[in-house]
Structure formats: C-alpha cells, structure tokens
C-alpha cells in the first residue's frame, strides 16, 4: 500500500504551526512509512509590519501580540518559547525563509542531499525564531541554518538565482489559494476532501488517517 499523502501548508512565522510540530512528530512516530508529508508554504506573514499594524492596532501592537503568543504557549508545556518573541526581533517577511526552504526542497528532489534535510532545516528555522528570537528573514541566518544541516549554500543560491525557487514558492502560494487554505497550519488529506485547519487536536488528525487506512480508495469519500 502506498503511503497516505498529507499535504501540509504552513507559514514559518506562524506560532500555531510551531506548536503543530508536536502533532506532526506524533503522526510520524505512530504511522511511520504509512504516511508521507508533502511540505508546502502559505503566506500569512508576507508583510509582518502591515499585518501587526492592522490586526493588532487596537490590541497593543507587537507587545499585545507577544502577550497573546506567550499565553497560547502556556497550553503547550513541551514547547520552548523566547519571552521576547516579536519584541527584540521582528522579521520583515516569511517569504525570505520560505524561498530558502523551497531551494532546499528542490535540492532534495534533485538528489543534492537527503530528502529529510528539508524537515531538518524547517525545524531549525522555526526553532531559531521561536526559541532563540533570531531574524529568520535575514540571509545570514539562512547561512547558519544551512551550515548546521551541512547544506551547500552554493547549491541553494543556484536554485534561487535561476528563479526556480521563486517559481516553486509561487506555485505553493497559488495552490494554497486554489485549495481554499485559510491559514497556517493546514493539513490536507484524501485529495482535498479532508482539510484540517488551525489548532487541530492529534486525535482528529488520527481519525482522518485511520479512515483512509481502512478505505484508501480515492473514489470513496471519507466520513471525516
């Protein structure tokens, strides 16, 4: 039986996607090779200054957003969160790290490094921001992530300079829009029939996967 594909959309600056890594890890431990995550990106923090100035204008701006995130993190004791998140460092855009990560994904597809390197870099990128409060929109931070994962930045630069990483990222953003992705994180299963958005509990994701394992045919709609 082929592994069940889970198309996973996220924005690397989204704290709920950072929390959702716990669910992704649990799914991988439980199902192993029976599931396959397909990592894609959506744009939630494409222009962070505008987003915060509009969505949080009457709620304390960056200070209010910081308090909101720290309160949300209190429900996830396993998670490490820097107390000055979004205060000491304010990344301008998630597009920059997304572009870097798409270049890594292209490199994995073409055999430049292992297919698991994207996951390693993605985890490191999120940890660098949410745990260390470093600016992940800065290319110097990208170089450090690449170095820790033994990624050749010359290869990454080749995919970016050729425009291929831009094209791949544009495809992600467009497909997110076409698929009705409302935000980050979003899990899509069963060729789009099952869409799980936001702070979704592990048991809900598990129930959707179990249903597909019982009835894997794409011709038969799931009850979930």
What is each model feature region?
Residues 3, 8-13, 19-35, 39, ...:
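C-terminal cap of thioredoxin/glutaredoxin-like
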Residues 19-130:
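Structural alpha/beta surface segment adjacent to cysteine/selenocysteine redox centers
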């Amino acid at each position: 039986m082929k592994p069940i594909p889970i198309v996973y959309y996220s924005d690397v600056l989204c704290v709920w996607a950072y929390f959702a890594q716990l669910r992704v890890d649990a799914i991988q431990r439980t199902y192993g090779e029976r599931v396959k995550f397909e990592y894609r990106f959506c744009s939630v923090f494409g222009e962070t200054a505008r987003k915060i100035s509009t969505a949080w204008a009457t709620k304390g701006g960056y200070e209010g957003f910081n308090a909101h995130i720290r309160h949300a993190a209190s429900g996830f004791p396993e998670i490490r969160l820097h107390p000055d998140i979004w205060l000491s460092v304010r990344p301008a855009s998630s597009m920059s790290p997304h572009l870097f990560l798409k270049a890594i994904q292209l490199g994995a597809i073409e055999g430049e490094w292992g297919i698991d390197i994207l996951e390693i870099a993605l985890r490191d990128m999120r940890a660098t921001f949410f745990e260390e409060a470093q600016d992940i929109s800065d290319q110097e931070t990208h170089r450090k992530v690449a170095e820790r994962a033994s990624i050749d930045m010359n290869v990454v630069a080749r995919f970016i300079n050729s425009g291929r990483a831009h094209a791949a990222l544009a495809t992600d953003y467009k497909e997110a829009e076409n698929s009705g992705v409302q935000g980050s994180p979003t899990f899509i299963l069963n060729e789009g029939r099952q869409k799980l958005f936001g702070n979704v509990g592990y048991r809900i994701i598990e129930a959707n996967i179990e249903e597909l394992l019982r009835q894997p045919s794409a011709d038969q709609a799931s009850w979930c």
